[in-house]
Each structure stands twice: as C-alpha cells, then as structure tokens.
Regions:
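A residue-level marker of the well-folded mature domains of exported/periplasmic proteins
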Residues: 1-308
Length: 308
C-alpha cells in the first residue's frame, strides 16, 4: 500500500490486467481501449491472457503481486473463483477492479473499499433483446397464433450474463402480456460453430414453429444466421434473430436486414469507467462498489453508426 501512496504522489502507477481469454472478440476490443486509456493517464500497463483457464489466471495474479503492481484489473475466468481471487490478493492490500464478469456482491463486500465492479447490467441486455422482438411488425408472433414460439442459444451456464439474458429476454415478452413457448434451449457456450449446428438441427426438427431465435451473444447469432439462411428462411419475414455484443459482422447484418437487432455491450464506455476507477485507486480517492455502463439497442435505424 505504501507503493500506491508513492505512486499517487508521482502520478505514475503500474497496472496489472488479467483478461479471461484474448481470443474473445469483445474482450479484444475492450482490452485495446483499456490499454490506450491507462497509458494516456501515464500508467505502465501489463496485460495477461488467462487462456480461459482459472489456474493460469491465478498464477498470473500471483506474478503481478510479486511484482508489486499498484492496481489489478481482473476479468475473471470463472466468477465462481472470484472469492478465491480476492483472498489471494487482499493480504497485499492491492486494490482490485473486476471487469465485465460480475462477482457476487458478497465477494466485493469481503474486501470493502479496495474492490469494485465495472460492467453492464446483463438484465438490461436481456430486456433489450425482448424489446427488439416486441418492436417488430408482428411483435414476435409471426404465424399469428397468439404466442411467441422460440429457441434459445445460451452461453456458459455458470456465467451470470448468460443466465440473465436467457431469463430477462423472455421476461420482457411475458411482462408485455405475451404468451411464449420455448421449443428448446441449447447450451452453445458462446460458440458460433456449436450454435450453427444446434440451430440447423432445430430448424429441421421444428421448422416453421420457430418464430424467434434468441442468442446470448452475437457469435452464436452469426452461427444461427448461417443455418437460418441454409434452411431457406428469411430473417424479418419468417423468423426473427437477436444477439448481444454489436460485433461488427453482426451490426452489418442488422444494417442488411439479416438480423433483427443486437445489443451493444459498450466496450468504450466500460473501458473508460474501468480506467477511471483505477485512477481513483491510484490517487487514494473514494471508489464506489459498482460502476454500471448502459447497453444500447441496435436496430436497422441506428446500426450504421455502430460499425467499427
């Protein structure tokens, strides 16, 4: 902690960043932004790739602690390991900024004043997905039988974002008084190829019954789109398709009418907030426990401005 005080006086700091996996599209955008903002503040930044393995990430955290970094920014491989991560770091007094994957509040409480979370509220992203469907011409009920029949492509089952998006996308429909029927929920673990295969199977099994394909992220939605097109279906005419992340390829598909919509997980807003929280820790200022960054609904009307 003494080093943090010295760092604050000189305005410089060493920041260690642990990303769950460099191969993740969204986290690549995020870490590029984050590195830029931290360096603009005059901090030296080291970013490590957890390679989607918690043991690897834990070793990286220990290395950063040995090096005496001033602040740790952590995008945990497993949110279920967040308490262990805090217990590893807390004896050193090093502040932690958790990003993008939300730990339980109890974890943040256990290291009060030295630990915060910067992210988007995944409930909102799910709600926005449901609203995208309610804003379509048929409100999701393409065949007019009085109910919205859908399939769901889900991310990592342990990930709170996946859980909330699955729940709140449908809650938006039922809150609007709609009757819904789930044909099947597929566990596609955020993966494009897995989703492509599952949606191909679903389309051959359920055919025209499928009115909406909900995907917890855009990678899975892009996989779903390939199978929808191969099956001779047309998004906007006989099926609706929504994702989350606003990846460039997905946004282009929204512009082209091949996806109903997506939800922007605002990497710029989140990276800005994470860098700001880091600066507060370096300066020894008061840090809030949560910093929430809004999602943005991306439709054909506004999509062009979100193409990166």
């Amino acid at each position: 902690a003494a080093s943090s005080t010295a760092a604050a006086a000189s305005g410089s700091a060493n920041v260690g960043v642990c990303i769950y996996q460099f191969a993740d599209n969204f986290m690549t955008l995020y870490r590029t932004d984050l590195e830029e903002y931290l360096k603009d503040m005059g901090y030296s930044v080291t970013i490590m790739d957890g390679k989607n393995d918690q043991n690897t990430q834990t070793e990286q955290i220990n290395t950063f602690l040995q090096q005496g970094v001033d602040v740790l920014i952590i995008n945990p491989v497993q949110t279920t390991s967040a308490q262990t991560i805090v217990d590893t770091i807390s004896p050193s007094g090093t502040p932690i900024v958790f990003i993008n994957r939300e730990p339980d509040k109890a974890v943040l409480d256990s290291y009060a004043g030295k630990c915060c979370y910067v992210g988007a509220d995944a409930r909102q992203s799910g709600t926005y997905q449901g609203e995208l469907i309610l804003e379509t011409e048929t409100q999701g009920d393409i065949n007019g039988d009085g109910k919205i029949t859908y399939i769901m492509c889900k991310g990592d089952p342990e990930n709170i974002d996946a859980q909330y998006r699955t729940e709140y996308s449908i809650k938006a429909l039922t809150d609007a008084g709609k009757e819904v029927e789930c044909l099947y929920e597929y566990l596609d673990n955020w993966d494009q190829t897995t989703a492509q295969q599952d949606v191909a199977n679903a389309l051959s099994q359920y055919g025209d019954k499928i009115e909406v394909v909900f995907c917890n992220n855009d990678a899975m939605a892009l996989g779903a789109l390939q199978s929808i097109q191969q099956a001779g279906r047309t998004v906007g005419k006989d099926v609706y398709l929504v994702g989350v992340d606003a990846l460039s390829e997905a946004v282009q598909n929204v512009v082209d009418g091949n996806m109903t919509g997506t939800v922007l997980n605002d990497d710029v807003g989140q990276a800005t907030a994470a860098a700001a929280a880091t600066k507060l820790y370096v300066e020894g200022s008061k840090v809030e426990q949560y910093y929430w960054v809004d999602y943005v609904k991306v439709t054909k009307e506004n999509a062009a401005q979100y193409i990166k």
